[in-house]
Amino acid sequence: VLDRFRVAYRFDGMRREVLVHVYETVDEMQAAAKTYDGRDVPDAGAAFRGFGYWVPGGMPAESFNGPIGVVLLCRELTTVEVVSHEMTHAAMHAYESLKIGHPDDPLGEHFHGGNEAPAYFVGGWTANALLALSRRGYAVTIH
């Protein structure tokens, strides 16, 4: 691992964290991703691995304050699009597993296949919007 850190965001009174690990190569990132759940990601340049609906010791995830998962990146693909894409997977995992949404909300029924469609939209739209703003002379700030 080249680098590792945590990012956090507070929503509706709940602070949630995601671990971020950066690897030198795609191969190293893919090997690391496989250690979390045994699944290969042969076509991926980045990945998200959620820590599940329950945490060690049987504590419900809703009351757990630790990281909800890990985003695995490689040095050569740390673009806004890729990072936004993987953070979308993290957000969907938080929504689904931590019950941020209303318990009767059928949203989860529409996001199958690993949430790839919304992650691609968010990643692409975010990258293109930031590029357009930058080209027009706007300063894009963190907050």
Question: At which residue positions do the language-model features occur?
Answer:
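Short, charged/polar N-terminal "headpieces" of proteins
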Residues: 1-42
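Residue-level detector of intrinsically disordered, flexible termini
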Residues: 7, 60, 126-128
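Hydrophobic beta-strand residues in large extracellular and virion-surface proteins
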Residues: 18-22, 71-72, 83
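Active-site scaffold of zinc-dependent metalloenzymes
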Residues: 26-78, 90-94
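Post-HEXXH active-site segment of zinc metalloproteases
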Residues: 76-81, 93-132
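Walker B catalytic acidic pair
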Residues: 86
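Long, well-structured alpha-helical subdomains associated
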Residues: 131-143
